[in-house]
Amino acid sequence: MATLKDVAKLANCDISTVSRALNNSAPVHPETRARIMEAVKTLGYKPNMVARGLKMGRRNLIAFVSPTIRLNIFSDLSVEIQREAEKQGYQTLIINSKADAVNEAKCLNELRSIADGIIIASTGRNNRLLREIEGDGTAVVQLIRKQDENISSVISNYYDTSKEAMHFLYKKGCRHIGILHGNENVKPFADRLKGYRKVAKELHLPEIISGNDALGVPGFMDGVNGTKHLLELDPALDAILAETDLQGLGALRALKELGIPCPEQIKIISLTGFSLGPMLETAMTSMAMPSPEMGRAALRLLLDRIEAKDRRPPLQHIVFNASLTERETT
């Protein structure tokens, strides 16, 4: 692997001149700079971004704090954030808070001294701590879960997403539409339920709701048990909105166990659209969030704040729309 000394030797100049040219820390004669850049290209020299960041008062390290790293949209987001951060010379820590407020606070307090910035899908229980961390100079961006209006965020329009899904199912002839719900203190779940209730009221449909109090991301067994609960609430159930793909997968399993055909008797739509959906034996219809674009947008916001130096960029809240992709479950 080529070193700074190798570049200096090939460019016929001293190491300090190479360092100034690469860091733009002081003027370098154009001809000398050209020789240095040609030497860098010839040798395939890669600067040590961590060391370079430390000299500039940065560590070139960001963190993504997620409530889970199981099969769900957060898996997609972590891959995208890590890929894009690497292109910009940043290393990424992926942290699983386990959707536990105490564990989340512990992680955040450790990260505030080592990371330049934090992207977080939070529990909503540590908003004051996040504001303190940002006030101390560590950039913070909320992703998926906008739990604090005073911190920049990237989210999807969860309210309109559930409304669109409800209208789609209604046009399919469904009149007893249930929802596998998450914790109402978590913004995406709360907004989806509001959209569901809005359309149910407009169309004079019954509300059939199976809730979940956990702060985490509802999973497979939540879908299995929730579907059975929905059928207990209304045996005429003819459609299910699943807030996550794993809930939807659990719903499919429950219907299979009960001998209920999908989509002939009960249709299912996932309101998240994780990449797992199309891979299922019965491919799932979904309101797909554009996770690659959302991950990149969150990273851009974070890097803007990290690299702003003395000025503080204005607060930004970016909202993406989900798109309906019809598959076999409807």
Indicate residue ranges for each PLM-predicted region:
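Bacterial carbohydrate/catabolite-sensing allosteric modules
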Residues: 42, 80-91, 117, 135-142, ...
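Non-catalytic positions within long, well-ordered alpha-helices that form the structural scaffold/packing
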Residues: 105, 111-112, 170-173
